[in-house]
Each structure stands twice: as C-alpha cells, then as structure tokens.
Amino acid sequence: VNGRLPEAPAEFEVRRGERVRLRLINPGGATTYRVAVGGHRMTVTHTDGRPVEPVTVDRLTIGMGERYDVVVEAENPGVWPLVAATVEGDSAPARAVLRYADAAGSALRDGLPEGLQTGRALRYGDLQSVETLPAEGAPDRTFDLRLSGGMMMDPDVWTMGGQAYPDAAPLEVREGERVRVNMSNMSMMLHPMHLHGHFFRAGNVLKDTVQVAPHMGRASFEFVVDNPGRWFFHCHNLYHLHAGMAREVRYV
C-alpha cells in the first residue's frame, strides 16, 4: 500500500470521532483486490471519481484502474490493519495501518479483517449516482463483444469480438448517438474494461471502468457520443492489453 511492504506498512493516524476519507486506487497491472479495514466498516461515496449515494459495506473489490472513495468512522480505538488481498486468496496481502492517536504502544491487531470474508460486500447494483444520468432508451448503435483469450491454441493472444489490437477494426460511432456495449467473458480471468474520454452508465451509476467476471460473466454499459476523437477501449490487465484486448472507439 502506497509503495510500502507489509513488513514496514504505511500508517494513517486518526483521532476518535473523526470521519476519515480513504481514496482507494488500484494502479496494479494484473491484480484485483478485496479491501477491508479491521474493526471498521466503509461508506462508499464515490466510484471512478463520480459521487454516489452513500452505501456502507464491510469490503469491496477493486479492479485494475478502478477508484473508490470511502469514509471510515473512527469510533473503535486501537491499531487496525487496512488490508488488500487478492481475489484468489488471502496469502501475502498488501497492508497499511490505521492507528488512533491515543493508541501509543498498542499492538497491531493480528490476522485479517473479518470483513474480508463476512458481512456485506459491495456490488455494482448497490451504487446509485447522485448525478443526473443519461436517460434510458433504445440505443442508436450496439456492440456485442466476446472477451476471450489465453486458450491452449494461442495462449499469448487476448481478443475483443474475436479481434486483437492493433489489427482490430475500430468501433465506429457518430457524435450525438447513444451507444450500448454488451460484453461476455468467455475466459477464466476477470477483465476490468476501461473506456477513455467518456463516462458511461453501468446500471444506475457513472463509471469509466467496469469489471467483467470470468466464466461467462456479462456486463453492459451505455454512453453518449459527445467527445469527438479516437479513444482507447481496453482491458486494464496490462498483460491482456499487451496481448491484444483493446479496440479503438473512433468518431466518424
């Protein structure tokens, strides 16, 4: 966390009664994390920089490129771990420390936060934008994209819609259109999909990055074509991006 190893973790000092904002950013190249704070719950207030109705959870999953702002109520004095564990398991998690100012000499609580395994996990369906969302309606254009790759026949190629960048055809759009993107994940790995230059509506929230679960997971989003240019749309797993899982969104 913040460039520090668990053996010498970053520490954040708080005082009892404070409301503490934590800005969680996953800049990783290939790791999705489950995040929890020992002895405390988290109230999510923003995702990808956009405000949402507050929702209180015990843990959240943050994909590569995603961002969350959460507020922690400092009402449980002590020295607590803030842990980011991989979605695959709990071995060697990243760690920081939430230390109350009056807890000098107190030892860090042992073990992983209970919230990593129990309690309420944040789901995209929990997120409700406080901003006005683009009205729902029939899209002017729809792209159906199968996310696949890593197969035995060609393990070093990852594709969107059966095509690998840079040889993939652009996704052509026209200014003023409402565009819908439907993604189905044919692979065994999670894909955090990121669109440059736009925020999109994913359910009832505005985001610019959305996770597509493995093993036939599906995700859809809609956006208004209102920022002319040539924009990158890609998986934020950098290994998949490098191996072709990207397309250009091109205004025509």
Feature roles, as predicted:
Residues V1-A121, V205-V212:
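Histidine- and aromatic-rich segments of cupredoxin/plastocyanin-like copper-binding domains
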Residues E7-A8, Q128-E131, D167:
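Glycine-rich, charged/polar anion/phosphate-binding loops
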Residues V44-D58, A138-V252:
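Active-site pocket scaffolds in enzymes
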Residues R67, V71-G78, S129, F223-R230:
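Eukaryote-biased detector of low-complexity, proline/serine/threonine-rich segments
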Residues V72, L82-V83, A96-L98, R123, ...:
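Short beta-strand element of the conserved SAM-dependent methyltransferase core
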Residues P113-T142, L147-G149, M153:
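Compositionally biased low-complexity segments at domain edges in trafficked proteins
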